[in-house]
Amino acid sequence: MNEEITLLAAAADPAATENIGWVQTIVLSIVQGLTEFLPISSSGHLRIISELFWGADAGASFTAVVQLGTEAAVLVFFAKEIWQIITGWFAGVFNKERRGFEYRMGWMIIVATIPVVILGVLGKDLIREALRNMWITASVLILFSLVFILAEKMGKKERDYDKLTMKDAIIMGLAQCLALIPGVSRSGGTISAGLFLGLKREVATKFSFLLAIPAVLGSGLYSLPDAFAPSSGQAASGLQLTVGTLVAFVVGYISIAWLMKFVANHSFSWFAAYRIPAGLLVMLLLALGMLNP
């Protein structure tokens, strides 16, 4: 799955100075939709594919805005649960007797979002520049695979959705901060944390998706003024960003439906089996000069 979040830091991306073509826009939007919810690093794949086939990074702001499409897919797929959380939270705010699980879930998501917002704002220059290095992305793709394997081995995977606590939310919220590093995967970080905490795979995955909504939507909306401004130097035009967001929405919805079925009966170690050779391949391409760091 944003997974990595380019977060609030992605708003101004001075590196993108040339317009990208429509083929690149569509391809990257499909990649965004496919990889946003899989624990294989969406931002890492976008950077790698863009550099490999078009010789340039499409930019953090392109990623942040197109992510709005994939997050819209989350809103539609989990519309019932989201509505229950929103109405339950407001009901609990104004009436103490109505403070049930949805009220607590609302606060869990709010509190768990705070760390990634703070780090996203404070570390925006680091996110835009130093961390968007292909060697870092390749290394993290490999190293974080070990975390997946350990989470699967050590996690008891027995706690259900209604057993989530504020402690779980805070820990998964801190894990979400790892998504600032391309190659980690936002979903990979939060789901792994959930497994270590003993949550069932499908529970950790579902909460990971819900937890991403405020941060990723905030990131994309924060980036909109700069992304659509003619003088912003963004790689894609307003029309390309709009179409790309719609494509990411459709592909993202399909990806969510598939992943929720997959995790019910399959280990996340399968994704580690993909990430390790992918990271090694990127390192080889870098060493051969076929990719720019």
UniProtKB/Swiss-Prot annotation:
The keyword Plastid does not apply. It catalyses: di-trans,octa-cis-undecaprenyl diphosphate + H2O = di-trans,octa-cis-undecaprenyl phosphate + phosphate + H(+). It is an enzyme of class 3 (hydrolase). Its EC number is 3.6.1.27. Its main location: membrane. Signal peptide: none annotated. GO terms for cellular component: plasma membrane. It comes from the Bacteria. Bacitracin is thought to be involved in the inhibition of peptidoglycan synthesis by sequestering undecaprenyl diphosphate, thereby reducing the pool of lipid carrier available. Belongs to the UppP family. This is Undecaprenyl-diphosphatase. The gene is uppP.
